[in-house]
């Protein structure tokens, strides 16, 4: 192995040949031991140079005859990082690879590369498959690590990090994050030295505008920016809103261009390079006015054209969805958030970190002296909500005016979600071959970020992990603070008179120590909306947002557990939607008992894990495969499980689309238009279909379902042939 000085010299030489010299946080990272193998976490604003810190770690790994992985949350971002690194380093002999999606592939072909840029999920898939070259990894860069707090994929990322650290003893981790709350807590868990910076290359001013006319207010902000020779990005809740607003603004923006500027833009759009790019007539029309919309429904080439024209200044305005928020390198003078509500749920506000990731794009280095991040509120009440939710405020000593200072959320683990625990129990068992519940809880999952945070959080419940059998007491411990449980065991919380006890409801009157009386109930009955009624208490706050039950319900639950035994063990977990991860996997036939009290994956369980299927998806496949008798029912099954995996709603138009893709010679872009799909969505659906058809084939073969196996393999072969011949030229 090369000495530290040799490594530093070689990495510095590579950077110099690429025309770069470390500065700012990059120099800080080197001083902190980056080129000596020290793991580093960088927490700093957009545009501060975080990416190069990761690249230096990867170059260090390569000079030490190791491989490097660069992990990102989105395929589009993976392509962007790949192209940048390929342009910088491949001519120096550093081989750069790209791998996204393709969960059915083994990844063995990636062994030829020194550095692989990929997504979290693809890396997780490779690790589950135990790809042969993974032991040779020396450095892993995890970009946008704040994704850890996302439901579902955050738990998968957390598990991936745990398993990488367990598998690779000398692994160097470089974690990159936008500014977040309590970054030291995350850095400590990762084993990283923290480099934190709040300095921005361009100063950013925040504003909240209260208006009864959102569209007009946005128009004024955009036009002021464009007329000042600046650029603007407007974030919208939905694709439809982004497209509609781009069309609405097109003529106004277009009038700000000179004849010469318009001519150059027209020439660019009509050039041979762009002639065959899949752009809708609507997008081409607005692009000719120097404005565009940007979302995941566009094909890759369409997004690339929009991004390139914006970076060159030929497009002045982008109306976007959140696809631009997650790491895409597109700063603008003015960034406008048109609505604070979540795209998936209008009742939910966007998270603080998500909002500041969007607004943090304001201010383009070398072009702007200042950036503006603006939130549009529909009323004074909404403006007050935006201010209290997303900002602190202070008085500027120079101007004596109020200035808004961003608030940032700490990153919370989502591994404790029941669905995530169930999946990760199977993942860990496949990794270990066999283990007891206690070995997993105290071992590999005991090293999780979930436990790391719980140990340091006074608000954490007494029991964080419960993988095995559940009872009324274990469930209460998952929803109560330690001191509450201890007081309950000593009968210090009050006394209970049980009034209701049946297979759906346990209820009674709880008299607290101060003499107050409360009507409490654990109800497993379904409401008219089809949801479990859950815990109820006349105190008005039966359960907090963090899942902590009130003292009165804990008192009722402990009394019921003592007096009613198995009835309480049945009703209380149901009322709180708690299940045993191990019990659930056993019922599905994914794990089974082994020797010495251990459990292990079945053949079906190992296949499920390595196919990268979620537990809800495999449950549906196993239930519906016996009823899949022809192509129509197979397409229905495929549509159903795609909806589960992606969280989207599909109807029969998907069946018609896929059937026509396979059987006709009509270009895919034309079929997308015919059946009402965006071209970007179609290629995503095809990719997902290829993976899930492969999964169906594997599970059908395991179940000796010859007919389904033939159907799924036939459909997969036809789809693969058509896709390979007609895939959009995205490379």
Where are these regions (language model features)?
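Conserved pre-motif I regulatory segment
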Residues: 2-43
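Conserved interdomain linker/interface between the two RecA-like ATPase lobes of SF2 helicase motors
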Residues: 162, 172-253, 285-296, 379
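Conserved segment of the helicase C-terminal RecA-like domain
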Residues: 171, 330, 334-337, 341-343, ...
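Conserved C-terminal RecA-like helicase domain
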Residues: 69-70, 79-82, 86-97, 240-317, ...
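C-terminal helical accessory/scaffold domains
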Residues: 427, 435, 566, 570-731
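Long, low-complexity, compositionally biased intrinsically disordered regions
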Residues: 453, 457-573
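Conserved SF1/SF2 helicase motif Ia
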Residues: 57-81, 167-170
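SF2 helicase catalytic motif II
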Residues: 116, 120-124, 130-173
């Amino acid at each position: 192995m090369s000495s530290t000085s040799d490594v530093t010299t070689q990495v510095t030489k590579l950077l110099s040949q690429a025309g770069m010299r470390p500065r700012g946080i990059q120099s800080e990272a080197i001083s902190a031991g980056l080129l000596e193998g020290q793991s580093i976490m960088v927490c700093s604003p957009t545009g501060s140079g975080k990416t190069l810190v990761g690249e230096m770690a990867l170059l260090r790994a390569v000079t030490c005859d190791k491989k490097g992985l660069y992990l990102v949350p989105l395929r589009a971002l993976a392509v962007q990082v790949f192209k940048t690194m390929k342009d910088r380093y491949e001519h120096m002999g550093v081989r750069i690879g790209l791998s996204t999606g393709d969960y059915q592939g083994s990844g063995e072909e990636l062994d030829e590369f020194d550095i692989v840029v990929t997504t979290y999920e693809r890396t997780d898939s490779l690790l589950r498959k135990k790809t042969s070259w993974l032991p040779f990894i020396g450095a892993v860069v995890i970009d946008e690590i704040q994704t850890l707090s996302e439901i579902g994929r955050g738990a998968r990322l957390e598990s991936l990090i745990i398993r990488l650290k367990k598998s690779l003893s000398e692994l160097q981790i470089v974690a990159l994050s936008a500014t977040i709350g309590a970054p030291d807590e995350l850095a400590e868990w990762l084993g990283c030295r923290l480099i934190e910076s709040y300095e921005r290359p361009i100063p950013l001013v925040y504003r909240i505008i209260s208006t009864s006319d959102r569209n007009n207010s946005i128009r004024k902000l955009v036009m002021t920016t464009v007329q000042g020779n600046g650029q603007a990005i407007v974030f919208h809740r939905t694709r439809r809103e982004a497209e509609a607003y781009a069309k609405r603004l097109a003529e106004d923006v277009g009038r700000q261009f000179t004849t010469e500027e318009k001519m150059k833009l027209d020439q660019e759009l009509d050039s041979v390079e762009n002639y065959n790019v899949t752009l809708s007539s609507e997008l081409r029309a607005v692009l000719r006015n120097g404005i565009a919309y940007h979302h995941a429904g566009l094909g890759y080439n369409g997004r690339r054209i929009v991004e390139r024209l914006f970076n060159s200044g030929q497009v002045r305005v982008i109306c976007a969805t959140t696809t631009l928020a997650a790491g895409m390198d597109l700063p603008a003078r003015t960034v406008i958030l048109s609505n604070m509500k979540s795209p998936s749920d209008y009742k939910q506000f966007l998270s603080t970190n998500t909002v500041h990731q969007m607004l943090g794009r304001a201010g383009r280095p070398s072009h702007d002296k200042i950036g503006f991040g603006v939130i549009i509120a529909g009323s004074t009440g909404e403006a007050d909500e935006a201010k209290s939710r997303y900002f602190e405020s202070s008085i500027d000593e120079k101007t004596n005016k109020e200035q808004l200072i961003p608030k940032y959320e700490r990153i919370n683990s989502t591994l404790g979600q029941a669905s995530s625990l169930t999946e990760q129990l199977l993942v860990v068992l496949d990794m270990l071959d066999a283990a007891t519940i206690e070995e997993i809880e105290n071992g590999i999952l005991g090293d999780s970020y979930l436990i790391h945070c719980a140990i340091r959080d006074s608000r954490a419940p007494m029991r964080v992990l419960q993988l095995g059998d559940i009872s009324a007491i274990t469930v209460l411990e998952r929803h109560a603070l330690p001191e509450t449980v201890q007081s309950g065991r000593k009968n210090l919380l009050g006394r209970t008179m049980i009034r209701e006890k049946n297979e759906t409801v346990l209820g009674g009157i709880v008299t607290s120590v101060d003499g107050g009386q409360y009507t409490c109930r654990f109800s497993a009955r379904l409401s008219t909306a089809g949801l479990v009624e859950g815990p109820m208490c006349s105190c008005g706050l039966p359960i907090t947002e963090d899942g902590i039950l009130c003292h009165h319900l804990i008192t009722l639950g402990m009394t019921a557990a003592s007096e009613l035994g198995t009835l309480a063990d049945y009703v209380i977990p149901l009322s709180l939607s708690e299940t045993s991860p191990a019990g659930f996997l056993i019922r599905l036939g994914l794990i089974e008992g082994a020797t010495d009290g251990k459990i292990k994956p079945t053949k079906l369980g190992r296949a499920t894990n390595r196919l990268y299927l979620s537990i809800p998806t495999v449950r549906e496949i196993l239930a519906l495969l016996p009823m899949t008798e022809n192509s129509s029912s197979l397409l229905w099954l495929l549509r159903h499980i795609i909806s589960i995996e992606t969280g989207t709603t599909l109807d029969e138009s998907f069946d018609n689309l896929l059937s026509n893709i396979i059987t006709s010679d009509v270009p895919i872009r034309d079929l997308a238009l015919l059946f009402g799909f965006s071209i970007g969505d179609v290629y995503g659906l095809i990719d997902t279909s290829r993976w899930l058809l492969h999964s169906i084939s594997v599970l059908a073969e395991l179940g000796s379902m010859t007919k389904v196996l033939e159907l799924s393999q036939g459909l997969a072969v036809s789809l693969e042939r058509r896709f390979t011949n007609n895939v959009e030229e995205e490379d």
